[in-house]
Amino acid sequence: VTSDHAVQNPKRLRAVGLVKRYNGTPAVRGVDLVVEPGEIVGLLGPNGAGKTTTFYMIVGLIQADRGQVFLGDQEMTHDPMVIRARKGISYLPQEASVFQKLTVEQNLTAILETLRLTAMERKQRLETLLRDFGITHLRRQKAYTLSGGERRRVEIARALVVSPALILLDEPFAGIDPIAVGDIQGIIAQLKEKGIGVLITDHNAREMLKIADRLYIMIKGGIQISGPPEVVTRDPVVRNQYLGHDFEVL
């Protein structure tokens, strides 16, 4: 983690010294984490390691007992989620977040209408999102008729309406079939190409390893190791307590 006195890239996410206790027992023990613009970062670990708690402290769903969260030089440790969103952090929960009875187009337009745009600008942004995410052919479909993979595409497109600096994805590979997983990985790669930082937590380590530039592996409330996938997967503690000795990325 860089010095607090250094000039920060306005789109760099930093979590510094995050701590969370439950009934006096530490769940998260001083976690430091960085996501650069245009970088895909995975937060992984066994159940009970503290990764979900850490992720939710960054999202704003859980308040940290100690530590700070920054986007660039903007501190947002105690900001509610809506303020974090205005500052540039979009969050995509695991559960379906689309309006089920609205069409795909209406789902995107509902968010576009919250922005200060002319009718023409709204229409242009809508068409760009539909095209970029390959959902133009679904524009008039009600959200409840979509497959898991199609719904995920719409949700990510919706999260990008506000042009965030960073997107936080909670279990993006859960509840979708293998073909759709590859599809979503392609979309996440697109986010990287647009210069958007991506922080992902997911139980599917194998799929995460295929797309992440860097990983943070949590064991017992702390970061055991961080680095590129080929480095962290060789760590003996990670092998012993999380991935297993026979683990291979297919």
Label the predicted regions.
Residues I167-E171:
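Catalytic Walker B motif of ABC-type/P-loop ATPase nucleotide-binding domains
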Residues E75-S90, E95, A119-K123, R139, ...:
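ABC ATPase NBD coupling module
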Residues K142-L146, E150:
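Conserved ABC ATPase signature
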Residues L44-P46:
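The feature captures the beta-strand-to-loop junction immediately N-terminal to the Walker
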Residues S163:
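Conserved catalytic motifs of ABC-family nucleotide-binding domains
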Residues T109, M120-L138, Q185-A189:
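Conserved ABC ATPase "signature" region
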Residues V59:
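Helix-to-loop junction immediately C-terminal to a conserved catalytic motif
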